[in-house]
């Protein structure tokens, strides 16, 4: 069994797939409670973003969640005043941003990138009356601070479903004689060799192989969450290697547009990419942050405690699929997608069923979930039981960091 770095991570970055809005400075946006009627209660919420909504991916997806939660809370008589800080780096500027939002009177401060957590944790002890959230992170379950929280979603469920869509297209190409079975090769643009990315592309691959048994995958890591040029270059290189399907764990739309320019297919992440690649992009999946934001903000409004480590999936609509591009999807895809989604929701299908993959030719019988001593090697909590590896069961942040057969890593990037 090969164990690789099990540190979880997230997206975000300064690279843009579309031109940035020059009128939007780095830093705070004035408090905005939107057009909803004022409620009986008001919660002031700070949101620290590594990018802005112009990325059309990672940060844009957070803004979409923020807006949906605000609307839902208004219907409950809770008014939300948002103070948003854009384009904050994973450095001391994040510490400053947390301090500024705390001093501005925020009741709750949300940090949207993995690299923000160490800086958030420097600030949180000084403001015990304020709740601090680090999305996609992992320290709160053991940091001994009562006012810090982590949150993530079971995005591997959506990845698996996107893989099913990709696999059905590949099998159609085989059946129609467009490619031979051995040419059903997926190219995957990954950010870093972290557990979140590994978990994502492994679940995607398993979904594809469930309907296209001959599929294989090549993974190219770009060493950045958001570098539109490098993402495009990686997608182009993968297509040149013979990959006929491209997917991604990166923030921009350039893998989609590159796939279209290369005449291959694509599945996306964080946003519907059909608009930029209508002849290539089949579907995407994204985390829906609205249920968590609504839960956390409502708890603060009511003076109630809330989970320090929160994770849900399709069971609470925290993971959703983008629209299926039925113009290019294989026949029967919509029906198959609905069938498999119901199996995931009901628990009948386990994404990391250990009977569906091997590691160096052997079935996985044991794997630890948590790294308790900081050496990047899991050493606690058996994750394999009842015939499956149980991802995000012991903590919200992913910890599946195994290199399974059928997936070729072309490089590694640990940041």
Where are these regions (language model features)?
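A residue-level marker of the well-folded mature domains of exported/periplasmic proteins
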Residues: 17-415
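C-terminal motif of bacterial Sec signal peptides marking the signal peptidase cleavage site
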Residues: 6-9
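Sec-dependent N-terminal signal peptides
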Residues: 1-2
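Bacterial signal peptide processing site
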Residues: 11-14
């Amino acid at each position: 069994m090969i164990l690789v770095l099990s540190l979880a991570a997230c997206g975000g970055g300064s690279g843009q797939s579309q031109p940035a809005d020059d009128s939007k400075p780095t830093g705070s946006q004035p408090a905005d409670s939107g057009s909803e009627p004022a409620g009986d209660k008001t919660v002031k919420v700070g949101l620290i973003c590594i990018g802005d909504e112009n990325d059309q991916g990672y940060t844009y997806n957070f803004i979409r969640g923020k807006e949906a939660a605000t609307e839902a809370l208004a219907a409950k008589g809770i008014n939300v005043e948002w103070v948003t800080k854009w384009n904050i780096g994973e450095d001391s500027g994040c510490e400053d941003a947390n301090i500024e939002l705390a001093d501005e009177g925020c009741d709750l401060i949300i940090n949207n990138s993995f690299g923000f957590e160490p800086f958030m944790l420097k600030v949180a002890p000084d403001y015990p009356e304020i709740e601090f959230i680090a999305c996609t992170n992992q320290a709160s379950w053991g940091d001994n601070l009562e006012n810090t929280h982590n949150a993530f979603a079971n995005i591997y469920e959506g990845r698996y479903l996107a893989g099913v869509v990709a696999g059905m297209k590949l099998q159609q190409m085989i059946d129609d004689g467009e490619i031979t079975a051995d040419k059903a090769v997926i190219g995957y643009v990954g950010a870093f060799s972290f557990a979140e990315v590994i978990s994502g592309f492994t679940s995607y691959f398993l979904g594809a192989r469930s309907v296209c048994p001959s599929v294989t995958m090549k993974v190219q890591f770009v060493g950045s969450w958001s570098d539109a040029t490098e993402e495009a270059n990686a997608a182009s290189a993968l297509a040149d290697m013979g990959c006929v399907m491209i997917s991604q764990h990166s923030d921009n739309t350039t893998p989609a547009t590159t796939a279209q320019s290369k005449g291959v297919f694509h599945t996306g992440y964080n946003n519907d990419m059909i608009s930029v690649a209508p002849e290539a992009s089949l579907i995407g999946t994204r985390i829906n942050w609205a249920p968590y934001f609504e839960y956390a903000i409502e708890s603060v409004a009511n003076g109630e405690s809330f989970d320090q480590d929160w994770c849900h999936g399709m069971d609470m609509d925290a993971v959703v699929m983008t629209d299926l591009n039925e113009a290019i999807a294989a026949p029967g895809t919509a029906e198959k997608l609905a069938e498999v989604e119901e199996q995931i929701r009901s628990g009948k299908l386990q994404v990391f069923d250990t009977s569906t993959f091997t590691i160096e030719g052997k079935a996985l019988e044991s794997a630890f979930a948590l790294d308790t001593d900081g050496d990047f090697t899991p050493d606690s909590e058996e994750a394999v039981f009842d015939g499956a590896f149980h991802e995000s069961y012991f903590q919200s942040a992913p910890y599946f960091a195994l290199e399974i057969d059928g997936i070729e890593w072309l490089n590694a990037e640990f940041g």
